[in-house]
C-alpha cells in the first residue's frame, strides 16, 4: 500500500507547513529606531590644558591661499551688502563680545582682535593657521575694515562682557621640523574624521576625504589668479562685528596627523587626521570656561544615521556651554558631497506630523544635529538663493552667505579669496561653503549679544531665527527659517521667549548602549505553536486516511 504522504494533497500540506517553519525561523532584519537625544551632565569633559591626545607631526605643507578675479577683493564682499551689515553697525558693532573660533587656528593680524585660546593639535597657543581656514572664518566675524569703509565707532559704547580669561599655558614644545610632501589639498570647511565601527559597505569613494572647500565644478569657468592689492591698499575684507574679540582655539588641521596614524577601517586607505569629535567637545568646554559668549564651529563630521557613533561627550559639552556658561553656539550645516556629507530629504507629504522630516534622515551632521543647543547654518549664494551644495537636514536653523567669500591671509595678511589647484590640471577654488555662512551668523550673534546683554544664549538664537527672511514654506531643511537679517535682529520687537531650551527635544541621533542579545522567546513560542498546529493537522490527515484505508 502506498504511503499516505504520497498523496498530492498531503504532500502539499506537509510542504506548506515546512515552508512556514523556515520562514518564521529566518532572521529578518529589524527596523532601525532613532532614539531621542539624551544629555548626561556627568559626561561633560574636564577642562584640561589644550593639547593632543597623542604625539602629532606635520604631514603636509601649509596651504597658501591666492587672489582670483571674482569676487573682486577691492570691493566689499557681496555677502556683506546682502545682509546690510553697514546699517546694522548703527545699532551694534559687537563691542566686547568674546567669540571663540574652534577651527584650524587664527594667525595674528593687526586687523583681527585675537587672543590665544589653546591648541589641540600641537599643544601651542592656537595662533597658527596652517590650513588658511580659521583665519578666513575669523575675518568674516571680526576683521576691521581697511579703506573702503571707515572703522565704525564702538556700539554700545561700553563693552558688553568682560575680556576673555588669559591664555592657557603651552603644554608641549613645538614639533621638530619634518620633511613634508608637496602642497596638500586645500582646506575649508575642515571635516573631522571619526573612527567608528564601519556601517554596511558604502558605495565607491564614500567617506573619502574630499577637498574641504568642495570639488571644482567642471561646468564652471576657471577663475584666473590676479595680483593681490599692494600692502595697505583698500580692500573689501570687513567683519560683521569688528569690535568683538576672537578667541582662537586650534582643534583641526589637515596638515597634521598622529605620529602613528591608524586607518579608519581595516580595508580603508583613509587616515585619521588631526581633530575628532571628542576634541571638539573639550574645545567647546574650554572656550566656554574662557568666557566666550559666542562659539563658532566651522568643522563638521558627517556620519550615517544608522551608525552615528558615540557622541554623548560632545552632547554634554554643548549642553554645558549653552546652558551653564550661556554661550551661543553656531555651527556649519556641512557641504553636500564632502567626506560622507549628503543632502537629506526635504519633506514627506505623507507625514505632515513631522514637518522637518526627521524620520527620513539618512546622514547626520555633527555638531549641528544637537539643535537644542546649536544654531546650524546653511548657505545661500550672492543673491540669497539656497546653495545646492549646502547640506540639508532638519537641524538647519538659518542661512547666510556662503559664496563670493574673502578673508585675510594667514601668511601675508592681505586679502585672499581662493585656493590654488591641488593637482596639475585642476582649477583655482574660490572660497565657498557653510563654514563661512556660520561665520556670518556668529558675527550677527555677537551684534545681538552686545546690544541685548541681558538675553540668554537661547533667547539670542530665538531673536536671530525670528527675524530671518523665511523661505516660501516658512521653514525648510535647506535654509531653516531663512536668510539672517542683522538689522531686524537688532531692531524688531521680538518677545524674549524661554530662557533655555525646553529640554533635550532635538531629534539628535545618538547611539544607545550596545544592545542586549536578541530576545527570541516570542519567535520561538510562535514557531512552537505553528509547529504544533502543523503536526496536529498532519496527524489528523494521516489518521483519517488510515481509517479510510481500513
Where are these regions (language model features)?
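C-terminal subdomain of the subtilisin-like protease fold in secreted/lumenal serine endopeptidases
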Residues: 175, 181-189, 452-548
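Hydrolase catalytic cores
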Residues: 402-479
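Active-site glycine-centered loops adjacent to acidic/histidine catalytic or metal-binding residues
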Residues: 103, 334, 433
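Secretory targeting and sorting signals
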Residues: 1-35, 527-545
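Catalytic-core segments of hydrolase enzymes
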Residues: 193-196, 293-410
Amino acid at each position: 500500500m502506498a504511503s499516505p504522504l504520497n498523496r498530492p494533497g498531503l504532500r502539499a500540506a506537509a510542504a506548506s507547513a515546512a515552508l512556514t517553519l523556515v520562514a518564521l525561523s529566518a532572521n529578518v532584519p529589524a527596523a532601525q529606531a532613532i532614539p531621542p537625544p539624551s544629555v548626561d551632565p556627568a559626561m561633560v569633559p574636564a577642562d584640561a590644558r589644550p593639547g593632543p591626545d597623542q604625539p602629532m607631526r606635520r604631514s603636509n605643507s601649509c596651504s597658501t591661499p591666492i587672489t582670483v578675479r571674482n569676487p573682486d577683493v577691492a570691493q566689499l564682499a557681496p555677502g556683506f551688502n546682502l545682509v546690510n551689515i553697514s546699517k546694522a553697525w548703527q545699532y551694534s558693532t559687537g563691542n566686547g563680545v568674546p567669540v571663540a573660533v574652534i577651527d584650524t587656528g587664527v594667525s595674528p593680524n593687526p586687523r583681527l582682535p585675537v587672543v590665544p585660546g589653546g591648541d589641540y593639535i600641537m599643544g601651542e597657543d592656537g595662533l597658527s593657521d596652517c590650513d588658511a581656514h580659521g583665519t578666513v572664518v575669523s575675518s568674516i566675524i571680526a576683521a576691521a575694515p581697511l579703506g573702503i569703509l571707515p572703522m565704525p565707532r564702538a556700539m554700545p559704547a561700553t563693552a558688553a562682557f568682560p575680556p576673555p580669561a588669559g591664555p592657557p599655558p603651552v603644554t608641549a614644545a613645538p614639533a621638530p621640523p619634518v620633511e613634508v610632501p608637496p602642497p596638500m589639498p586645500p582646506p575649508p570647511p575642515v571635516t573631522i574624521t571619526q573612527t567608528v565601527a564601519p556601517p554596511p559597505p558604502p558605495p565607491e569613494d564614500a567617506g573619502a576625504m574630499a577637498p574641504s572647500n568642495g570639488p571644482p565644478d567642471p561646468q564652471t569657468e576657471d577663475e584666473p589668479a590676479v595680483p593681490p592689492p599692494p600692502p595697505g591698499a583698500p580692500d573689501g575684507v570687513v567683519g560683521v562685528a569688528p569690535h568683538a574679540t576672537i578667541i582662537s582655539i586650534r582643534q583641526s588641521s589637515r596638515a597634521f596627523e598622529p605620529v602613528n596614524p591608524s586607518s579608519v577601517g581595516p580595508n580603508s586607505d583613509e587616515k585619521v587626521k588631526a581633530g575628532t569629535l571628542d576634541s571638539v567637545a573639550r574645545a567647546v568646554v574650554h572656550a566656554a570656561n574662557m568666557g566666550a559668549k559666542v562659539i563658532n564651529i566651522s568643522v563638521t563630521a558627517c556620519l550615517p544615521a544608522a551608525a552615528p557613533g558615540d557622541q554623548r561627550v560632545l552632547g554634554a559639552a554643548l549642553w554645558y556651554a549653552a546652558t551653564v556658561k550661556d554661550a551661543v553656539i553656531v555651527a556649519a550645516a556641512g557641504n553636500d558631497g564632502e567626506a560622507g556629507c549628503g543632502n537629506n530629504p526635504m519633506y514627506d507629504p505623507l507625514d505632515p506630523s513631522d514637518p522637518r522630516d526627521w524620520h527620513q534622515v539618512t546622514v547626520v551632521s555633527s555638531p549641528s544635529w544637537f539643535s537644542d543647543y546649536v544654531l546650524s547654518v546653511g548657505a545661500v549664494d550672492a543673491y540669497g538663493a539656497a546653495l545646492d551644495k549646502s547640506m540639508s537636514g532638519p537641524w538647519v536653523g538659518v542661512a547666510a552667505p556662503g559664496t563670493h567669500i574673502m578673508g585675510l591671509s594667514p601668511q601675508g595678511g592681505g586679502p585672499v579669496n581662493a585656493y590654488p589647484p591641488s593637482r596639475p590640471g585642476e582649477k583655482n577654488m574660490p572660497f565657498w561653503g557653510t563654514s563661512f555662512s556660520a561665520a556670518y551668523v556668529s558675527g550677527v550673534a555677537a551684534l545681538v549679544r552686545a546690544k541685548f546683554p541681558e538675553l540668554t544664549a537661547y533667547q539670542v538664537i530665538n531673536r536671530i531665527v525670528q527675524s530671518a527672511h523665511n523661505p516660501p514654506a516658512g521653514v525648510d531643511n535647506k535654509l531653516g527659517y531663512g536668510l539672517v537679517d542683522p538689522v531686524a535682529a537688532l531692531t524688531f520687537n521680538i518677545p524674549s521667549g524661554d530662557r533655555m531650551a525646553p529640554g533635550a527635544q532635538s531629534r539628535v541621533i545618538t547611539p544607545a548602549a550596545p544592545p542586549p542579545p536578541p530576545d527570541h522567546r516570542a519567535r520561538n513560542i510562535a514557531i512552537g505553536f505553528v509547529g504544533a498546529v502543523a503536526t496536529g493537522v498532519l496527524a489528523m490527515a494521516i489518521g483519517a486516511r488510515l481509517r479510510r484505508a481500513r
